[in-house]
């Protein structure tokens, strides 16, 4: 009878361990990947056509509170197609920065690094649909809509400071 009780107890402990392990696997790591296609609306003198392209943003779980704002560290990588008087060039974007979010609705993010051939910044600000997507619809994604802008000390390799801006729509996936 004792061996039957011990076997039952071991089976119960094993089942509980499996349940705990299963719960751990479903827990999010706090990172997100976001892809933001951008349609250019304004351009600097370096461009005859407004650049179009996309930026990939990797948001980390690392950050802190700044009063009512949530700050998180992120990195951005992107590629855009530009043109000046028939000559095509493709500025890339690589930067490290952060995101500020107010009430899971209004956001602003900035990244400093390389834009084209020079140092530069990327900014993206607007509204987040996080509350609707995650709380209302229980989806692991977020949609952000806003203005996106780029400024560089040397976009095309010609040594001139320029930039562009446009409308960005980003889809973030949390994992």
Give a label for each model feature.
Residues 133-175:
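Ligand-binding grooves and catalytic loops that recognize ribose/phosphate and carbohydrate rings
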Residues 1-66, 164-175:
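Short glycine/proline- and aromatic-enriched beta-strand/turn motifs that initiate or cap beta-hairpins
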Residues 57-61, 97-101, 124-128, 170-172:
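Outer-membrane beta-barrel architecture
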Residues 71-100:
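Mid-chain, structured segments of secreted extracytoplasmic proteins
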Residues 42-52, 65, 81-90, 111-124, ...:
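Solvent-exposed loop/turn segments connecting transmembrane beta-strands
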Residues 61-69, 103-107, 130-138, 174:
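Outer-membrane beta-barrel channels and translocator barrels
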Residues 29, 95-101, 140-141:
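Short hydrophobic/aromatic-rich motifs at helix boundaries and adjacent loops
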Residues 31-43, 69-81, 105-118, 128, ...:
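Transmembrane beta-strand segments that form the barrel wall of outer-membrane beta-barrel proteins
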């Amino acid at each position: 009878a004792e061996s039957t009780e011990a076997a039952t107890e071991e089976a119960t402990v094993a089942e509980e361990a499996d349940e705990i392990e299963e719960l751990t696997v479903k827990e999010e790591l706090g990172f997100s990947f976001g892809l933001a296609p951008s349609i250019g609306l304004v351009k600097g003198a370096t461009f005859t056509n407004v650049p179009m392209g996309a930026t990939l943003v990797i948001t980390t779980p690392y950050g802190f509170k700044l009063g009512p704002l949530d700050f998180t560290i992120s990195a951005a990588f992107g590629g855009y197609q530009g043109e000046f008087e028939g000559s095509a060039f493709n500025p890339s974007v690589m930067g490290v920065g952060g995101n500020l979010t107010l009430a899971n609705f209004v956001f602003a993010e900035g990244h400093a690094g390389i834009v084209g051939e020079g140092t530069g910044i990327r900014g993206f600000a607007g509204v987040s649909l996080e509350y609707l997507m995650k709380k209302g619809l229980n989806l692991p994604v977020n949609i952000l809509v806003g203005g996106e802008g780029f400024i560089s000390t040397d976009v095309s390799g010609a040594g001139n400071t320029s930039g562009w801006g446009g409308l960005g729509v980003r889809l973030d996936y949390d994992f």
